[in-house]
């Protein structure tokens, strides 16, 4: 969420530094949010249909990297505008996918509630840091802010890759255990009490 908060909170400032007046700069943010909202709906619908979210997260991360690359590179204001557009079009779907993944991969009402609360709390704590990434003296390209966010995106890619590898391995192990009939040794109530540790629980990728 650092890239999302960093760019969102500083978006009017970034656009204003491109030569637009304050009122116009506010209006120029509308296409970003309208497109991002549409993409979130499309990604959410498609991910639910195919029961996978990691491909969309990877696509979103790479879209953000491309956007930040355009922002950092020197060029006309239109290039920076396009870069920020790509960043937000990737950041919002990635954030929604992450929130749902946490809910899908934690079983047990208390565990799921605490897990979601922890993720949202840590995400919102990033606001206090992210709003300081884009300083007025770094205008108009804000290389420092964009570079810091690139680091967070790369870290997100690494974490997502590890998470997919880990959960894929667990799913394969549990599939083998189910094939051996291990789940038949327990009652449905016992399996339910095991939550996401149960051999019948399949992690969402």
Specify the residue positions occupied by each region the protein language model found.
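Extracytoplasmic gate region of multi-pass secondary transporters
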Residues: 1-45, 55, 95, 99-100, ...
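Hydrophobic transmembrane alpha-helices of Major Facilitator Superfamily
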Residues: 2, 6, 38, 77, ...
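Helix-breaking motifs and short loop linkers at transmembrane-helix boundaries and internal kinks
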Residues: 19, 51, 74-75
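Hydrophobic alpha-helical transmembrane and interfacial-helix anchor sites in secondary transporters
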Residues: 46, 102, 136-138
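Structural signature of the two symmetry-related core transmembrane helices
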Residues: 54-70
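Hydrophobic core of transmembrane alpha-helices in multi-pass small-molecule transporters
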Residues: 67, 78-103, 119-121
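A late C-terminal transmembrane helix in Major Facilitator Superfamily
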Residues: 109-143, 148-152
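Intracellular terminal tails of multi-pass secondary transporters
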Residues: 141-205
């Amino acid at each position: 969420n650092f890239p999302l908060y960093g760019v969102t909170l500083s978006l009017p400032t970034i656009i204003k530094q491109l030569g637009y007046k304050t009122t116009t700069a506010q209006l120029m943010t509308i296409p970003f949010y309208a497109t991002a909202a549409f993409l979130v709906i499309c990604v959410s619908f498609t991910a639910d249909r195919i029961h996978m979210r990691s491909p969309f997260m990877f696509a979103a991360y790479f879209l953000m990297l491309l956007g930040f690359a355009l922002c950092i590179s020197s060029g006309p204001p239109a290039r920076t505008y396009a870069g920020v557009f790509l960043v937000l079009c990737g950041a919002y779907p990635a954030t929604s996918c992450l929130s749902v993944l946490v809910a899908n991969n934690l079983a047990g009402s208390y565990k799921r509630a605490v897990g979601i609360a922890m993720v949202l709390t840590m995400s919102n704590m990033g606001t206090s840091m992210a709003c300081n990434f884009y300083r007025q003296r770094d205008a108009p390209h804000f290389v420092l802010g964009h570079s810091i966010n690139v680091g967070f995106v790369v870290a997100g890619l690494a974490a997502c890759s590890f998470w997919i590898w880990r959960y894929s391995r667990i799913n394969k192990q549990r599939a083998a255990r189910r094939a051996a009939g291990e789940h038949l040794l327990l009652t449905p109530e016992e399996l339910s009490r095991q939550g996401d540790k149960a051999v019948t629980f399949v992690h969402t990728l």
